[in-house]
Amino acid sequence: MNLSQSFLLNRYIQSPRTWLHRLNSNNKIYFLFFYLSIFPYTDVKYMTYSIIFYTILFLYLKHIDKNYKIFILRIVYKVCIFTLAISCLSKLLLSVNIFRLKYISDFFLNLMSICTRNILYIRSVLILTHYFCTVHITFMTTTYEDIIFAFIPLFTQYQNNIIKKVAFISIFALQAIENTLIKIYSILITIKMKQFTKVFKFQYYIYIYLILKFIQDIYNDIYRISTVFYVRELNHKMSYFTYIY
């Protein structure tokens, strides 16, 4: 059985290649693994800066087929305009009597107080957003096989049941998740193409049918995979990892 068969290639950008593609896959994966491990312990301010950087990087990858110099200039231009607008607005508010410095200070103090009370939720949202952006950009610039093979030296060095279980489950879990996402995208495309939203009389019945069909497909996939594992007696004890690069 080919465990390195990838269902994530639909995210990978084959062409054109960027500087992220040319980085060594092992070094890139090790750095991101270490970076994501220490990221939850950083300050909220640095989390926000990091998410802004990832957003710019993500937009850059989305528009890589265009002239990237013009795209970068547009981003810098928009950031400068936004900064200038905030600066002018602040000076305008300070010049108006109704918005004195005292009221502006109270506003920022109240805003900081609200952020402090909800700092746990803010950190959670920032961490989840950062993880999502990091994983998505990694899959856009690194093949799934390179990600798995980056950890092969560790698997060969520490051959024990726990690592084999984690590797065995992770390989099939990622493929199953991607297959589930493909099913969801197919349902959404079907709804848009058939224009079910215009059929008000049977709209909810169609949605219920699609949801039940989706659950039935997931059950069939689980049953089929479990049957194959049982018939062929596949488990983590049969996993043998070797570094082929």
UniProtKB/Swiss-Prot annotation:
Cellular component aspect of the GO annotation: chloroplast membrane
Highest taxon of the lineage: Eukaryota
Coiled coil spans: none
Compartments reported by the entry: Plastid, Chloroplast membrane
Disulfide bond annotation, renumbered to this chain: none
Sequence intervals crossing the membrane: 38-58, 79-99, 119-141, 171-191, 199-219
Entry keywords, A to Z: Chloroplast, Membrane, Plastid, Transmembrane, Transmembrane helix
Membrane topology value: Multi-pass membrane protein
Principal subcellular localisation of the protein: plastid
Entry's family note: Belongs to the ycf92 family.
Name the UniProt record assigns to this protein: Uncharacterized protein ycf92
Highest classification ranks of the organism: Eukaryota, Rhodophyta, Florideophyceae, Rhodymeniophycidae, Gracilariales
